[in-house]
Amino acid sequence: MAGSGSSAPWGKHLLHAVLMVLVALVLLHSALAQSHRDFAPPGQQRREAPVDLLTQIGRSVRETLDTWIGPETMHLISETLSQVMWAISSAISVAFFALSGIAAQLLTALGLDGDHLTQGLKLSPSQVQTFLLWGAGALVVYWLLSLLLGLVLAVLGRILGGLKLVIFLAGFVALVRSVPDPSTRALLLLALLTLYALLSRLTGSRASGAQLEAKVRGLERQVDELRWRQRRAAKGARSVEEE
C-alpha cells in the first residue's frame, strides 16, 4: 500500500511533464513559424521558413496529436485557440498603439523625436501573438527544467549521502588501524564524528525544511477545508431551523 501510494505522485508528475513537453513543442513550433513571418525582412517573408530540428519535432507532435485526437477535432481546437489568441493579441496591440501615441506626444512636447523613440511599441497583433507564444513556451520550459533539476538534485542528494557514509567509514577504519596512541585516536575520531554530524546537519536541513514547508501547506489546506465544511454545515442548520 505504501509503495502504490508513493508511486502515484511520481506517475502524476511524469504525466504532467509529458503533457508539458507536448505543449511546449507545439507552442515553440507555432512561435517559430509566426516569428519567421512577422519579423523577417520584407524580401524574405515570402520564402519558406527553414526546416530545423525544432520545427520537425513540432510537426511530428502535431501529426501525432492528429492521429490520437483526430484531424477534425485537432483542427477545431487549433482554430479556437487561434481565434482566442488573435483576440487577446489585438487588444494588447491596440493598447500598445494607444500608449505609443501618448508617449510620442509627451516626448514631442519635450523636444524629442517621439515617433522614432516609440516606434518599438507599435506592435501588430501578429507580432504580439509571437511574443505571447514564445513567452508561454518559455514558461513551460522553465517549469520542466525546474522539475528536472529537482529530480536530479534529489538523486544527487541520495548519492552524496551514501558517498559521505562510505568516506566516513573508510576514515574510521584508517584511523583505528594507523593511529596507535589511544588519546590521539580518540581525538581524531571525535573530530571525524563532529565533521560528519555537521555535514549531515547542513545537507539535511534543506530537505527537512522543504518537507516541513510542504506539510505546513497541506495542513493549512486541510484547515481551510474544515472551516468551509463547518460554515456550510452551519448554514444548512440555520436553513433547517428557519423552515
Curated annotation (Swiss-Prot):
Q: Which residues cross the membrane?
A: 84-104, 136-156, 186-205
Give ranges for the Cytoplasmic compartment: 105-135, 206-243
> Which Gene Ontology terms cover its molecular function?
voltage-gated monoatomic cation channel activity
Is Lipid biosynthesis among the key words of this record?
A: no
Tissue localization of expression is: Widely expressed. Expressed in skeletal, cardiac and smooth muscle cells, in brain, including neuroglial cells, cerebral cortex neurons and cerebellum, but not Purkinje cells. Also detected in Paneth and Goblet cells of the small intestine (but not in the epithelium), duodenal gland, pancreas, parotid gland, testis, thyroid gland and adrenal gland, as well as in epidermis, choroid plexus, ductus epididymidis, lymphocytes, fibroblasts, endothelial cells and seminiferous epithelial cells (at protein level).
Q: Which UniProt keywords apply?
A: Endoplasmic reticulum, Ion channel, Ion transport, Membrane, Nucleus, Sarcoplasmic reticulum, Signal, Transmembrane, Transmembrane helix, Transport, Voltage-gated channel
Q: Which GO terms describe its biological process?
A: cellular response to gamma radiation; intrinsic apoptotic signaling pathway in response to DNA damage by p53 class mediator
Q: Where in the cell is it found?
A: Nucleus outer membrane; Endoplasmic reticulum membrane; Sarcoplasmic reticulum membrane
Lumenal face of the membrane: 34-83, 157-185
Primary site of residence: nucleus
One GO cellular-component annotation of the UniProt record comes to: nuclear outer membrane
Domain of life (superkingdom): Eukaryota
- Asked whether the keyword Coiled coil is assigned, the reply is no
Provide an example Pfam family for this protein. BRI3BP
Topology term for the membrane: Multi-pass membrane protein
| Catalytic activity annotation | K(+)(in) = K(+)(out); Ca(2+)(in) = Ca(2+)(out)
Q: Which InterPro entries match?
A: TMEM109
Task: Share the record's PTM remark.
Answer: The N-terminus is blocked.
Annotated signal sequence range: 1-33
**What does the UniProt record say this protein does?**
Functions as a voltage-gated monoatomic cation channel permeable to both potassium and calcium. Plays a role in the cellular response to DNA damage.
Q: What is its quaternary makeup?
A: Homooligomer. Interacts with CRYAB; in the cellular response to DNA damage.
- Name the chain's protein: Voltage-gated monoatomic cation channel TMEM109
